[in-house]
């Protein structure tokens, strides 16, 4: 999905602040407060934290200009959250210092910014803090969630740039995790990153119903402005910004998503195929003091994890993915990625 200028009306509702200085950094961020726009001040509301990808934090404010997540302050999305609203927070990595979300040196500074935000906004429901991230931001989410699992109720990892480690997966064994990846992503390779992550999560979790894996055969390409290099099928977050409805058109039985998203399929940790999955309703089921899950009706029949994670031969043979992997290594050595 291209940048939507009409979403600027939502960006104008966001404010800026920063957390306390921890070590070398005080993390600045953009945020939306539902109580500033009519939400009942007697209620508590979830907090959704989104860690964006590299280059989206190049300067202050870009973190809400470079993607469409600010649209979640629209009433149609706010109304889907527990208690009918949610705080939204998009922190910015100090990229001007060459530091990105994948670097563990930011974990304590980011955690301090979140705690400080909750202290400043008394209507935040501290049992419903949700953490989302994509690309390098998903690595920041892995780092933070595994370091402080008690802080978060659930996490969503999109197009991770590396596989989770065994120790990280073990620390997340009680946390609901939704993993998303495109099997044809030429930047974050499915077989190297997402697939091993899924296997480790499934083998360590205390509740497989709390896990979800969404894969695509086609997603949106990403172009790096400074060198015009395409990261094919890498952008999954535009679809997340639409709560997987994508302009009101949900996941359908023909495996087609409106626009560039095709071949979307979602399963839980048991291998059950899930019909019509949506991010916000899934997040809203969880608290960090009483994790639970309600099984979503399966589409057709339950399939095994082993059967699901193989490529669907109707769309693409596994060898094609290996070719993409080899090309990616070559492109990186040539400096094209």
Predicted regions and their residues:
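Gly/Ser-rich "nucleophile elbow"/oxyanion-hole loop immediately N-terminal to the catalytic nucleophile
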Residues: 37-43, 98-135
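Active-site machinery of serine-nucleophile hydrolases
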Residues: 45-47, 51-109
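Short alpha-helix in the alpha/beta-hydrolase fold that links the catalytic acid
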Residues: 62-63, 189-203
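Primarily recognizes the serine-hydrolase "nucleophile elbow" in alpha/beta-hydrolase
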Residues: 127-171
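C-terminal catalytic histidine-bearing segment of alpha/beta-hydrolase fold enzymes
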Residues: 180, 186, 192, 203-331
């Amino acid at each position: 999905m291209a940048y939507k200028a009409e979403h600027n009306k939502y960006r104008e509702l966001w404010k800026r602040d920063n957390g306390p200085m921890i070590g070398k950094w005080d993390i600045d961020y953009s945020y939306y407060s539902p109580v500033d726009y009519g939400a009942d001040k007697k209620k508590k509301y979830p907090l959704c934290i989104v860690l964006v990808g590299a280059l989206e934090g190049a300067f202050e404010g870009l973190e809400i200009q470079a993607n469409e997540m600010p649209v979640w302050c629209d009433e149609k999305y706010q109304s889907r959250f527990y208690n009918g609203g949610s705080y939204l927070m998009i922190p910015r990595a100090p990229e001007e210092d060459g530091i990105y979300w994948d670097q563990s040196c930011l974990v304590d500074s980011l955690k301090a910014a979140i705690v400080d935000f909750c202290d400043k906004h008394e209507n935040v429901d501290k049992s419903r803090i949700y953490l989302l991230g994509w690309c390098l931001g998903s690595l920041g989410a892995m780092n933070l969630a595994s370091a402080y699992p008690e802080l978060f109720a659930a996490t969503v990892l999109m197009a991770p740039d590396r596989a989770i480690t065994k120790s990280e997966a073990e620390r997340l064994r009680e946390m609901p995790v939704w993993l998303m990846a495109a099997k044809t992503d030429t930047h974050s390779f499915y077989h190297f990153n997402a697939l091993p992550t899924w296997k480790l999560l499934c083998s360590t979790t205390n509740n497989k119903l709390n896990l979800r894996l969404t894969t695509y055969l086609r997603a949106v390409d990403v172009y790096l402005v400074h060198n015009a290099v395409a990261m094919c099928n890498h952008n999954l977050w535009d679809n997340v910004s639409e709560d997987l409805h994508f302009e009101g058109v949900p996941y359908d039985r023909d495996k087609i998503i409106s626009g560039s998203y095709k071949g979307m399929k979602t399963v839980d940790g048991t291998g059950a195929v899930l019909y019509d999955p949506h991010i916000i309703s899934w997040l809203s089921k969880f608290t960090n003091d009483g994790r639970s899950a309600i099984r979503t009706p399966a589409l057709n029949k339950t399939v095994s994890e082993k059967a699901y994670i193989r490529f669907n031969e109707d769309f693409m043979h596994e060898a094609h993915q290996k070719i993409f992997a080899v090309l990616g290594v070559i492109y990186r050595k040539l400096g094209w990625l």
